Amino acid sequence: MTTSCPPPSISDREEQARILCLRLLTARSRTRAQLFGQLAKRGYADHVSERVLDRLAAVGLLDDNDFAEQWVRSRRANVGKSKRALAADLRAKGIDSEVITTVLAGIDPAVERERAEQLVRTRLRREVLSEDDARVSRRLMAMLARRGYSQTTICEVVVAELAAERERRRV
């Protein structure tokens, strides 16, 4: 049985850090900052962590740009998060501001508003409308606020979609 031997220039500690990073990356994609945090949490020295992470980036296993693009695509499609909420999520994951700006530059405000309208329409189908729209309105506004939409967008979309749903149910 043959085993792969690490190059002689790599210390045992670096090899352990590399194996840990590979195991973490096997589970799911992660940012450089997240991996650095995991290595620090387990007591690896900063210089060891930097060398391992630089090597992973050099071979293409660690790419914050790619991570950010995938994250934005996934969260917009599945959760319906706004540009502002996505930026906050990426900042929390340790992505650079320049990368965040680049990735979010492609989001069109009209498409974002359309997604908010779609979310409200979907939720309204399940709501029972009574004479008092305040409860339904409050719930819809809270849903959009949790997804990071601006107050202006929230108010405009909820008022318009509530009126459209009332008209649709009247017919």
Swiss-Prot record:
Disulfide bonds: none annotated. InterPro entries: RecX_HTH_1st (IPR053926), RecX_HTH_2nd (IPR053924), RecX_HTH_3rd (IPR053925), Regulatory_RecX (IPR003783), WH-like_DNA-bd_sf (IPR036388). Keywords: Cytoplasm. Pfam families: RecX_HTH1, RecX_HTH2, RecX_HTH3. GO terms for biological process: regulation of DNA repair. Modulates RecA activity. HAMAP family: RecX (MF_01114). Belongs to the RecX family. NCBIfam families: PRK00117.3-1. This is Regulatory protein RecX. It comes from Mycobacterium leprae (strain TN).
